[in-house]
Structures are given as structure tokens and as C-alpha cells.
Amino acid sequence: MTKVERLLINYKTLEEFKKFKEYGIQELSMLEELQDNIIENDSTSPFYGIYFGDKLVARMSLYQVNGKSNPYFDNRQDYLELWKLEVLPGYQNRGYGRALVEFAKSFKMPIRTNPRMKSAEFWNKMNFKTVKYDMARDKGENPLIWHPDMDREMTPGESA
């Protein structure tokens, strides 16, 4: 079983994030975001990751958003924004990305994400759906959403 952990905001995590920057693309970089948040080891962190041994191999950021200010879901309910999900090369296709998304789904809140880098097939397998584009709301992004009810609507035999 793959364990998802809340990542500490500290210099060790900063060093781990540098490995992602070496392989990833700039828009997925969390270095600056982490540097801005380094305060103390026990600070509440929006970063989650998966370790293989002592090496961070997959990560994402997850934020709770007040739905009243950014309506993606009916009743303008609060939701999670899942950002910058990334798995290091050599560790891809082992279920780490799926484990991170399933962890986010375990909060039983709607989720919004903005897919990157030819990842539509992955998000489709995870049962995320496109939303009707709204220029004022989406500002050039192409968000995908998931709602807990979406997984309950799946037919028997399908997997999330």
C-alpha cells in the first residue's frame, strides 16, 4: 500500500523539490511556493507526497477553497484545488499519481484541477470531467472537476 504523507515545510523538503525541477517543467515547479512558506517544521503544509524509501518520488499541492468566491460546483460549496501533481521519471506508471488523487478524493469534497502535459487520459481514468468554459472564471485554463457523487454513478466493473 502506498502511503501519502503531508510534506513538512523545511529545507529538507526544499532539497527534494529541487529534484523535481531538474526533470519537470517550470509551470510544475513548487520551489518558489515552498520557499515562500518555509517557516517552521510543524507549519501546516499544502504539500503532499509519496516516498520510495527515503526519496520523494511523487508530490502534489492541495488547497481548500471557499466555493462562494469561485463557483465550479452546485450550491457554491467548498472544494479542493489539486495542483502540480508530478511523479519523477523512473517512478511513473507505478500507481503513485493515482494514490495521490485517491488521497485527495478521500476527503469526500469536490476537486478542481488544471491538467498539464498531455495528462487528459490519466484524469479521465480518475473520473474527472471537463466543465463548460467560462472566460471570467477560468482565465485561460481548462479545468477538470470531480465530485464524490461522480464515483457513485459509475457502472459496475469500471474502476476509478
Swiss-Prot record:
Q: List the keywords (alphabetical).
A: Acyltransferase, Transferase
Gene3D superfamilies this protein is in? 3.40.630.30
GO MF annotation: an example: acyltransferase activity, transferring groups other than amino-acyl groups
Q: In this protein, which residues make up the domain named N-acetyltransferase? A: 7-151
Q: Name one Pfam family in it.
A: Acetyltransf_1
PROSITE patterns (UniProt xref): GNAT
The UniProt entry, under InterPro entries, shows:
Acyl_CoA_acyltransferase (IPR016181), GNAT_dom (IPR000182), YlbP (IPR017274)
The broad enzyme category this protein falls into is transferase
User: Which cysteines are disulphide-bonded?
Assistant: none
Q: Does the keyword Acyltransferase apply?
A: yes
The EC designation for this entry is 2.3.1.-
By what name is this protein known? Uncharacterized N-acetyltransferase YlbP
